Each structure stands twice: as structure tokens, then as C-alpha cells.
Amino acid sequence: MLPHVLRVLTLLCCLSGFALAQDWAKPRLEKSPRHLEWVTVRHGNRDVRCWVAYPEVKDKATAVVVIHEIFGLTDWVRGVADQLAEAGYIAIAPDLLSGTGPNGGGTESLGGPDGARSKIGSLPPDQVTADLKAASDYVQKLPACNGKVAVGGFCWGGTQTFRFVSNHPGVKAGFVFYGSGSENEPELAKIQSPVYGFYGGNDARINATIPKSESLMKKAGKVYEPVIYEGAGHGFMRAGEDPAGSPENKKAREAGWQRLKQILKGL
């Protein structure tokens, strides 16, 4: 029962912060000077469409797997990958809804956020983890990658981040943006990387799960460092990028980005 409740909780929280129109996200992406491309990553009988952004750097770079929100691989999520590339990292954002749409399509074929939501709740957890591992393995083997891979996710993707680091010990760090943590103690005991949390102060439903995550991670001897950005709401990394976003969300987004980049720099 509890895992089902957590899934519903994640759904409700993600819905609360979504702006139906994200027209502001695409123009920035289209103006990017960096190399951006679509690739198809195959594992088993699955073809996963992934968005890859490359930095303009001299040396090999650390890679980041970006896990999308409940709305699928949107322009904003692709923009996050580009902004990570701007900061000097290779970013890969898999469309975990690949194959769920008409004619085997993914997010783009589902007709918007409602269509994505209707599919994402029924994705098998093991399939999601396998898709993420395939994306991680792909980017880690790129000639431009230095072999280091971190993972970060937003909302639903934040929850998936916790699960992924539990099942993929090679990850250097996990970044959970306003996602609930696992309460599966044996699963948490498998985590070998530090987990960093980013939460909005005005997000009581998700923040109510933080103490339990802290307790279980401490009991397991794992590193979990949550930070709450006061005044910000759920989804502040996206809402703070919206030109019409509140000052609190904008401030939290900027602080979140700075923290993320500082941690990545130290990996």
C-alpha cells in the first residue's frame, strides 16, 4: 500500500507545479551553440530515444543522466541537458516513455502533459531502471566522457533517482529534485554514492518524506544531504526558469543550479 501512496503523492505534487505552456523553453534551446543530438539506445527488446548535449570543452567530461518529470521528455528537460553542457558536462536525457505512444512513439506522440501522465504511472519500475542503466552505460562509453557518471531527476524523476542509485553502484552522485525517497531499507543499503536533495520550502507533501529518508539513510550509513529552499514551491527548477515565475522560485532555481554545479565540480 505504501509504495502506491508514494506514487500518488508524487503525481499530485508534480501536477501542482506544471505550467501547461512552456513556450519559453524552446527558443533558448534552439539558440544553443552546443552540439545537441537524438540517439536511440537499445537494450534487450527496448529502443529508448535519448537527447544528448555535449559541452564545448578541451578535456573529457563527466556525464549526467537527466531523469524527466511526470510530463515526459519536454523541451524544458532537454534545456536542462543543454544547460549542463553549458556548464561543462555531457548530459543524456532518456525518454522513458519511449514506445508507449501511437506507432511506438514517446513523449512527443502523446499529445501533451495529460497524455504523458496517463502513461507514466504504469511504467514497470524495473523497465525504468533498465532504461536508465542503458542510457548511463551509453554515455559512459562515449569517447568524450571521462568515465564518471552522475544522475539527477525532477519530481517523478527525483523519486526514480533514489531507485536508480540503489541499483547502479557505479554512479558518482545522485541529485534528487523534489522527489520522495525510498522506504525500502535493503534497497537503500545498496547505495554507494552520495545523494543530494533539493526541495522547495512550500512543498509540504514532499518535504514530509524527508525525515524518513534521512533516518533510513543514516541507519544504512549512507550520505544524504537535503537542502530546503524557503519560499519556493514544488517544481521550482522549472518554474524559476519561467519568465513569469515568482521571485522565490527564481532565487531557489539559481541557488539549486549553483549547488549542483559545485558538487559536480568536486566529483
Question: Residue spans of the language-model regions?
Answer:
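Serine-hydrolase catalytic machinery in alpha/beta-hydrolase-like enzymes
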Residues: 29, 38-141, 238-242
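C-terminal catalytic histidine-bearing segment of alpha/beta-hydrolase fold enzymes
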Residues: 218, 223-267
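Acidic catalytic loop of the alpha/beta-hydrolase fold
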Residues: 202-207
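An N-terminal hydrophobic leader/cap segment in hydrolases
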Residues: 5, 11-41, 48-51, 156
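Alpha/beta-hydrolase fold nucleophile elbow
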Residues: 143-154
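Gly/Ala-rich beta-loop-alpha elbow adjacent to hydrolase catalytic centers
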Residues: 153-157, 161
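Short beta-strand/loop motif that positions the catalytic acidic residue
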Residues: 191, 197-199
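A conserved short beta-strand
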Residues: 170-180
